[in-house]
Amino acid sequence: MLRVGSYVPRNASGGKTQEGNNTLQATAGKLRIVARAEWRLGEEAGDPWEGAKAGRWLGEGGSAIVRAGLRAWKESGVEEVNGRGVGIIGVGRGGEWPGWLEETSVREVVEKWRDKSPLWLLEVLPNLPVAQLAVEIGARGPVETLRERDGIEGDVEKRIQRWGKRGGKWVVSVRLTSTGAKAEVWGCEGEK
């Protein structure tokens, strides 16, 4: 263990003495990709999430994110890991309203509400598939969901490396694609 102490003098901005100790893992360092996987929409063979009840409200794209992440996690060969040492970063398009909701009045929405299950609300939450993946693999580290934009790959890699420097052992990065989802497991080879 590497112990880091910090002290901010009394005349620093804020006017308070701020002391704190931060304990970092001595093994903290650069994480590398140790496994990659993909899940295509409509794929059925080798489903790592077969029979899961949670998949019914995630929608096709959300389920693809969870399945790609689970497949990559399995292929990484990680056996036992402290859940706090595992983080998840997801990249997606964000939630979209269902087609039946477009161009309808408030009255029509209320009337259709009785016919349609309110579980569709869960499908429009962009962070739900990433949170579900964290539950499935037992990750208790940071769970982040980012919106797709130009330059997002660099931002994701910076976040992964920052997590590695703070003592994180594993990060599962998942991304929604036009054909399904892709996932990468970042970690230290020696930690398996």
Please name every model-derived segment.
Residues 1-192:
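Conserved "HGTGT" condensation-loop signature of ketosynthase/thiolase-family condensing enzymes
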